[in-house]
Amino acid sequence: MRNNGKVQGFELESLKNLGPVSSRQLQAVGIETIEQLETMGPVQAFQLVANQFPSETSVTFLYALHGALLDIPLGEMSDQDKARLRDQARG
C-alpha cells in the first residue's frame, strides 16, 4: 500500500520497538504516520489496537508504543513508567 509515494507503515517501523506486525496493527486502526501516533499518544493507540486485536495485544505493546515515541528500548523503561501507563490504559 502506498500513500504519497511512501510505503504505508514503513515510517512507523523506523521507530524503536516497532516492527511490521505492530505497524500493520496501527494502520488497521487508522494510525499510519509517526505524527498521528504522537498526536494520539501511546495509551489511546494501545486501546484502539487492543480493541481491534484483543487476542494479539498485550501490555508489552503499550510499553513498546511509549518507548517508540521517546526512543527508549523496552528494557530501559522504568517500572514506575510501566505502572503509570497501565493505570492510564485502564482509565
Task: Go through each PLM region and give its residues.
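Residue-level recognition of specific faces of alpha-helices
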Residues: 11-14, 25, 36, 61
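Alpha-helical interaction/regulatory segments in DNA maintenance proteins
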Residues: 3-6, 46-74
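Catalytic DNA-binding helix-loop module of base-excision-repair DNA glycosylases/AP lyases
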Residues: 21-29
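Beta-strand-rich cores of mature extracytoplasmic or soluble domains
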Residues: 78-91
